[in-house]
Amino acid sequence: MKFMKKLSLFIMFLVIGAFFSENSYSKEKSSNSYYEYTTEKIKIYSDENKKENIGTLIKGTRVNVYDTKEIIKKSKDKKGNEIEKKTVMKKITYKDVHKTKVVWIEDGYLVSTLNEAVDQRFKNLDFTKKEKKEYTDNKRVKVRGLYVSAHSVALKGRLDELIELAKKNNINAFIIDVKGDYGELTFPMSDEINKYTKSANKNPIIKDIEPVIKKLKDNGIYAIARIVSFKDTIYAKENPYKIIVYKYGGKAFTNSDGLVWVSAYDKNLWEYNVTVAKEAAKAGFNEIQFDYVRFPASNGGKLDKVLNYRNTDNLTKAEAIQKYLHYAKEELESYQVYISADIYGQVGSSSDDMALGQFWEAVSSEVDYVSPMMYPSHYGKGVYGLAVPDANPYKTIYQSTKDSINRNNNIDSPAIIRPWIQAFTAAWVKGHINYGPNEIKDQVKAMKDLGVDEYILWSPTNRYEKFF
């Protein structure tokens, strides 16, 4: 009898303990699910009395508020009268890469949504949670890839050489041109393409894509189709009324390379690019990578007032790019391919879209993988406090990756970060260094030290042998 009473008491304590434990856990969980966002760059402190300024948080940083205190400081004015200064301080947590940090900030700099926190031109972007699937017949792969041009694929024996090099050096993916830098289509496609272009598919350099895909898959190589989106000379020639021009005089706008750009507002080009992507998916590619998914560089947006982007829907640049990627993702979902987007390397470190339409959280929320082009040679003098970023591959990649991870921390369904890294020597950069195996290792280590284990090497000539 005594035993039964003791057993009953024991069970009761267990139930009560479980009840309180569950309630405590639920409360903790509930607290962590409510976020606020910083409205500007703000100082962070080690305690509520602001004894030590330990850094800053950028605009739009996601935080949790755990405590609020009113701090009263007494002092005297010049006449000896006692005065009080009241400051409301908030104890918050935020994620710095993968660590949760606890700091204090002044009140008055938080709002409840990211849309409220960002600048006016980004307030209509969609930062809501999106489903990111894994397909049963197309498993995700942690990519360690090489860019392989269509010419390398078509050149007799070269693809075999690159496959052997990949096997020996732990490379498991090739990024292959499907729609190239001038808008050329690289393998024969169906008549569906003819609705959008008369000449882009006339002389494809890869005569038969089927044996290429088979060879890649037989050798365990994950196949990614690179599709250049809005830099398209062929489409521009066929559709001169869709290119970006100067408002006064109608002259075609070009960057320093002399190439014209089609506006990213052109929905016919959206459809064309996605139709090409569907052809690639049907051919057996595992993933579609959209490159040049941006507006052309316009001197930081200073030229926007004199350029005609043919913006009939009155969208911002960032809205157009996000809507394009969203459209592509929806259209390609039934083909069970993953979607990735290439963006400028410094987008993760920038508080805006760099006047390109590439706003980090907007792009990352839409695609499966985001590939910032983190070539150290492409970072200007003094960026990240480095005199010559090209000569500091580890530090450049580390800081750029860190900033990118922290931008991902602001949204619920971010893309996996898979940077492009430099496999070439930038002889045009003053103070540059020669790149070889050690510089590749430095870049990979910088990412790995931050938990990023996917990357792609870019060499425009595909001469990768000297980098391993």
What role is predicted for each listed range?
Residues R158-E184, K282-E287, L450-D453:
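Catalytic domains of carbohydrate-active enzymes, especially glycoside hydrolases
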Residues V367-H378, P393-Y398, D403-S404, N408-F468:
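Substrate-binding cleft of secreted/luminal carbohydrate-active enzymes
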Residues Y135-V153, F230-E279:
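Active-site-adjacent "subsite" loops/lids of carbohydrate-active enzymes
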Residues K27-S30, G80-D137:
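Boundary regions of SH3-family modules and the immediately adjacent low-complexity/disordered segments
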Residues A173-V178, I205-F253, Q289-D291:
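Glycine-rich, aromatic-flanked loop segments that form ligand/cofactor-binding clefts
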Residues I224-K231, Q289, K317-L356, D412-F424:
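Aromatic-lined carbohydrate-recognition surfaces of secreted/lumenal glycan-active proteins
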Residues S46-K59:
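SH3/SH3-like (including bacterial SH3b) beta-barrel domains
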Residues N169-P204, A297-D304:
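Aromatic-lined carbohydrate-binding/catalytic grooves of carbohydrate-active enzymes
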